[in-house]
Every structure is written in C-alpha cells, then in structure tokens.
A protein has these predicted regions:
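Structural motif
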Residues: 14-16, 94, 131
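Rossmann-like NAD(P)H-binding beta-loop-alpha module
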Residues: 64-93
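Phosphate-binding site of ATP-dependent enzymes
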Residues: 104-194, 198
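Conserved metal-phosphate-binding beta-hairpin within the catalytic cores
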Residues: 198-210
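Conserved N-proximal alpha/beta basic substrate-recognition cap immediately N-terminal to
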Residues: 1-75
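Short amphipathic alpha-helix with an adjacent loop that forms part of the alpha/beta core around
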Residues: 3-9, 80-88, 121
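Short, solvent-exposed loop/turn elements at beta->coil junctions and helix N-caps
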Residues: 2-4, 134-138, 207-209
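Short acidic/polar capping segments at secondary-structure boundaries
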Residues: 46-48, 73-78, 98-102, 112-114, ...
Length: 210
C-alpha cells in the first residue's frame, strides 16, 4: 500500500503480493475502484473481483467443472453445523469464509466433533458468507496440485504438501512445495477450468485435489 504513488505513471499493474487482501477487503475493494481508472490491471478487474469470492466454485460447477461438494451459507444465517451435516451427509468437512486465503479461519471437522466448532462457526457467520465443503482426505496423503498458465499455455506445476498431522498445505502452516510433473489429463482438465472463467485470464492457477 502506497497512498503517495501515482498509478497514472503505470501502464499495467499485476496483482503479485496481496496476501492479506481478505483481512482488509473493504479497503482493498475501495483501492481497486479508485485505481482502475488510472492504470490497467492484469488480470482484468472484473476477473480479479470474481476470483476473490469462493462462490466462483458454484459458477464453475454450473459450467460443468467437477468441484468439491460445497454448501454456501449466507452471512447471519441461523443454520447450524448439525443442520449442515444432516443435509449433506458428509463424514468430514471444512468450514471457511467465502472471502479468505492462506487457510485463515479454516477448520476441519467431522460428525463426531463438530459440536466443538458451533461457537466458532456462528461467530464467523455473523461477519462472513461461509463455505461448508466436503473434506477430501487425500490432501493429507497426496497433497494439492497447482498448475500455472500464462495466456492459454501451461507453464509448470507444483505439489503442496501439508506437514504431518495437518491438512493445510500453505507454508504459513508448515506446508512444503515440490516440483510436479502433471499427466496430460490433469493439464487438459486445468485448461478446461480456465476456459470456463467469465473472461480469459492472462495468468491463472488451477488447484487439483484427488
């Protein structure tokens, strides 16, 4: 953040290190609105804003992309975790805000222990739209694959692995990263995901979990 910098001096701006945008989302959104008339964002501003809210998963699902089974809960809803487990029949689940990152306020729970998280869930729900998502246990065994595209071209991939005893693959939580060589089917699926975005990104990352 630099209030002094004149963005009219910049022809293009790439979103590179906005790791905490979700903690200051209103401020971030206001900056976007103010700055979009002074420079050109890469990716386009409409796509950036679309991608900040994990409701994009429903958009992709409606386009035929296979995504993790997910329930979206509106802020200030009275629904409980008990209700959600009954509705979905998930054995394990993840809860997190729709606008979030780096696994902040992300919790893993199951049918036996969800009662311990009701208070936390209700507290988060007062301020956020929330996700209730089926937990895919393979992430603790195999990890999460990220495929990177520049334009429409696949460039490289990595595998993110959670530390032992955790499910969060981010390095903030002890996760590690290694080079990954995806098979053709993984690349093609990731390309399909990118093609379904509301507009075509100049750069993109697609995360895969088995």
């Amino acid at each position: 953040k630099d209030e002094v910098y004149n963005w009219k001096n910049t022809k293009y701006a790439i979103f590179r290190n906005t790791w905490d945008y979700f903690e200051k989302f209103e401020e971030f959104n206001n900056w976007i609105i103010k700055t979009k008339t002074k420079t050109k964002f890469i990716n386009c501003i409409e796509l950036v804003k679309w991608n900040t809210d994990k409701k994009y998963l429903k958009f992709l699902s409606d386009k035929g992309i296979n995504v993790s089974k997910t329930e979206f809960i509106n802020k200030k809803s009275s629904i409980s975790l008990s209700d959600l487990f009954k509705k979905t029949q998930f054995d394990q689940a993840i809860i997190k805000p729709c606008i979030s990152g780096a696994a902040k306020d992300t919790y893993r729970l199951n049918k036996s222990n969800f009662h311990r998280f009701e208070k936390t869930f209700n507290s988060l729900l007062k301020k956020n739209d929330m996700i209730f998502q089926e937990f895919l246990s393979n992430i603790t065994i195999f990890g999460e694959i990220s495929l990177i595209f520049i334009g429409k071209q696949f460039t490289h991939a990595v595998k993110k692995i959670a530390k032992k005893g955790d499910f969060r693959v981010q390095d903030d939580h002890g996760g590690t990263v290694e080079v990954y060589n995806p098979v053709k089917e993984e690349i093609e699926f990731a390309k399909l995901c990118v093609s379904k975005c509301p507009s075509q990104p100049i750069y993109a990352r697609v995360d895969l979990i088995y």
